[in-house]
Design a protein with these regions (language model features):
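Class I S-adenosyl-L-methionine
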Residues: 26-29, 33, 77, 125
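Thiol/selenol-based redox catalytic cores and closely related redox-interacting motifs
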Residues: 46-127, 131
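Short, Lys/Arg-enriched N-terminal segments with co-localized hydrophobic residues
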Residues: 2-12
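Local sequence-structure signature of Cys/Sec-based thiol-disulfide redox active-site neighborhoods
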Residues: 12-31, 40-42
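Short glycine/proline-enriched coil/turn segments at helix->beta-strand junctions
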Residues: 36-38, 112-113
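Short, well-ordered coil/turn elements that cap or connect secondary structure elements
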Residues: 11, 34-36, 63
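A short beta-strand-loop structural module common to alpha/beta enzyme folds
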Residues: 38-48
Length: 131
């Protein structure tokens, strides 16, 4: 299922950051489309989040930084991050995340007052009521 619909970036538009080959991202995209929620699509493999973006999203989310790591990914496992992350500072973790989009948990849904990491329909339902 190709990800083809891309809306022009507008101020206040929700950013949908995904990896198009990821089935969870495909389900999340379908959910956004089915709920008629406009978004700007960004391929995390081609356009990895910057340090500034990740820092802002992390601070806005209220989530532990570990939640931003794709713990089921091959790169995460090959780098043995399960054992290394507990010893790392937040700054070190953020700098590591920006090195490769495949380390970042996806999809990400980013809005003015919104940061959702991963796709859980129950958490995403609130945004469909705002649009």
């Amino acid at each position: 299922m190709p990800l083809t619909k891309v809306y022009l970036e507008r101020e206040n538009m929700i950013k949908f950051i995904c990896y198009p080959k990821c089935t969870t991202c495909q389900r999340a995209k379908k959910w956004l489309d089915d709920n008629k929620i406009e978004y700007e699509l960004r391929d995390i493999k081609l356009d990895n989040p910057t340090l500034e973006e990740l820092t802002e999203w992390y601070n806005k989310s209220g989530l532990p930084l570990k939640k931003f790591f794709n713990t089921s990914g091959l790169l995460y496992k090959s780098l043995d991050l399960k054992n290394k992350l507990p010893e790392m500072t937040e700054e070190e973790m953020l700098k590591l995340l920006v090195t490769d989009g495949m380390l970042v948990k996806r999809p990400l849904l980013i809005g003015d007052d919104l940061v959702l990491v991963g796709f859980k329909e129950t958490e995403w339902k609130d945004i469909s009521q705002q649009n």
